[in-house]
Amino acid sequence: MAELSTVARPYAEALFGAARDDKAGLAVWADLVSEMAQVAANPDVREAMADPRLDDKQRSEVFTGLIKSQLPQAARNFIELLVKNDRLLLLPVIATQFVALKNRHEGTAQAEITSAFELSDAQVKELIAALELKFGLKLKPHVSVDQELIGGVRVAVGDQVLDTSVKAQLARLRDTLAA
């Protein structure tokens, strides 16, 4: 995976630079890049893009035809570049890196919050407020439920994980007793 990230990084940075300078705004581009990544991740699309009977122009036309959103010329050019360099199927990795660049630019981060039970809106707001103080970033929460946690929450912000779940506490206790 590290190799794919390395190959995808220059494309993500170039796309981010173009999006940052576009009057449409980063949010519009983030949605567009996400849609392109979803299309590229589709197994049928991956198979079609690997068809040796299609030339680069046909691959570009087929792919752009599958995108429901209106594509600006810069996005069409980007798709053509990816097809020409045989990198179109890297779009999911490029999209992940694009979002990371966008978040860094905006001083925000994605907070993956996993709870043992459904959290109310008030609980999520309170948790996000505390986490924003801890991490020093504006956080965008994505909340999910995993009953295997037994209780508590697990929060991942970037590569940092804060796990206060009962499951994690029991695992630490088990490790301490086994030592």
Curated annotation (Swiss-Prot):
Top-level division of the source organism's lineage: Bacteria
Alphabetical keyword list: ATP synthesis, Cell inner membrane, Cell membrane, CF(1), Hydrogen ion transport, Ion transport, Membrane, Transport
Keyword tRNA processing among record annotations: no
GO molecular function: proton-transporting ATP synthase activity, rotational mechanism
GO CC annotations, alphabetized: plasma membrane; proton-transporting ATP synthase complex
Keyword Cell membrane carried by entry: yes
Residue runs in coiled coils: none
InterPro entries: ATP_synth_OSCP/delta_N_sf (IPR026015), ATPase_OSCP/dsu (IPR000711)
Pfam families xrefs: OSCP
Subcellular location: Cell inner membrane
Membrane topology according to the record: Peripheral membrane protein
Subunit and partners: F-type ATPases have 2 components, F(1) - the catalytic core - and F(0) - the membrane proton channel. F(1) has five subunits: alpha(3), beta(3), gamma(1), delta(1), epsilon(1). F(0) has three main subunits: a(1), b(2) and c(10-14). The alpha and beta chains form an alternating ring which encloses part of the gamma chain. F(1) is attached to F(0) by a central stalk formed by the gamma and epsilon chains, while a peripheral stalk is formed by the delta and b chains.
HAMAP family: ATP_synth_delta_bact
Function description: F(1)F(0) ATP synthase produces ATP from ADP in the presence of a proton or sodium gradient. F-type ATPases consist of two structural domains, F(1) containing the extramembraneous catalytic core and F(0) containing the membrane proton channel, linked together by a central stalk and a peripheral stalk. During catalysis, ATP synthesis in the catalytic domain of F(1) is coupled via a rotary mechanism of the central stalk subunits to proton translocation. This protein is part of the stalk that links CF(0) to CF(1). It either transmits conformational changes from CF(0) to CF(1) or is implicated in proton conduction.
Family label: Belongs to the ATPase delta chain family.
NCBIfam families linked to this entry: ATP_synt_delta, PRK05758.2-2
Designated name of the protein: ATP synthase subunit delta
